[in-house]
């Protein structure tokens, strides 16, 4: 007997509701033209890595808990004397989410993490890059439920980039609004 395959809630919502809403609004000639989420890239830069080389490893462990996937340690491409950074020195961590993990992270981000951000007034609707990708920053990684507040010795910021197959910012903005992204008015 075949077991039912797990499908994330937001992916199911995209297939059943969001695709139809996008088709009605933009009237695409082909259903393959309807924009969809491509990937989510989470980057955590660790500026204190110059003083303590263990910091990027700690940040990577927190990022792994948040994303549910092992991150890659990013290294400096060239030396910068002013920042005391040497070439190939670990300076952060990043992870690329696709598929089910991407939809699960998006669900937690929109419904749990963003409402917990202090003084949150909504996402900047101008943070699109002109090609349908949205970038945002979070100053404290403790807004995610996977991070235990009592065990955190230092708070890290992170960049979150949501890449879509949309060709214009308007299409991407509509897609993310359908995924209930809280944009500022």
From Swiss-Prot:
UniProt-listed GO biological process terms: translation
GO molecular function, one term: rRNA binding
Cellular component GO terms, alphabetical: ribonucleoprotein complex; ribosome
InterPro entries: Ribosomal_uL5, Ribosomal_uL5_bac-type, Ribosomal_uL5_C, Ribosomal_uL5_CS, Ribosomal_uL5_dom_sf, Ribosomal_uL5_N
Alphabetical UniProt keywords: Ribonucleoprotein, Ribosomal protein, RNA-binding, rRNA-binding, tRNA-binding
One Pfam family here: Ribosomal_L5_C
Family, per entry: Belongs to the universal ribosomal protein uL5 family.
The protein's role, per its UniProt record: This is one of the proteins that bind and probably mediate the attachment of the 5S RNA into the large ribosomal subunit, where it forms part of the central protuberance. In the 70S ribosome it contacts protein S13 of the 30S subunit (bridge B1b), connecting the 2 subunits; this bridge is implicated in subunit movement. Contacts the P site tRNA; the 5S rRNA and some of its associated proteins might help stabilize positioning of ribosome-bound tRNAs.
Summary of subunit composition and partner proteins: Part of the 50S ribosomal subunit; part of the 5S rRNA/L5/L18/L25 subcomplex. Contacts the 5S rRNA and the P site tRNA. Forms a bridge to the 30S subunit in the 70S ribosome.
Name of the protein described by the UniProt record: Large ribosomal subunit protein uL5
């Amino acid at each position: 007997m075949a077991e039912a395959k797990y499908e994330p809630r937001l992916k199911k919502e995209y297939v059943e509701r969001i695709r139809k809403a996008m088709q009605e609004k933009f009237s695409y000639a082909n259903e393959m033209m309807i924009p969809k989420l491509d990937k989510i890239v989470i980057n955590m830069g660790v500026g204190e890595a110059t003083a303590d080389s263990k910091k990027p490893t700690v940040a990577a462990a927190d990022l792994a808990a948040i994303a549910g996937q092992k991150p890659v340690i990013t290294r400096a491409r060239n030396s910068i004397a002013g920042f005391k950074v040497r070439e190939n020195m670990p300076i952060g961590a990043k992870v690329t989410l696709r598929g089910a993990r991407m939809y699960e992270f998006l669900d937690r981000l929109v419904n749990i993490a963003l409402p917990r951000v202090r003084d949150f007034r909504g996402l900047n609707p101008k943070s699109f890059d002109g090609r349908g990708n949205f970038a945002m920053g979070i100053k404290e990684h403790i807004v995610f439920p996977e991070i235990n507040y009592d065990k955190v010795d230092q708070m890290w910021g992170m960049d979150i980039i949501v890449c879509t197959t949309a060709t214009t910012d308007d299409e991407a903005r509509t897609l993310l609004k359908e995924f209930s992204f809280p944009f500022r008015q």
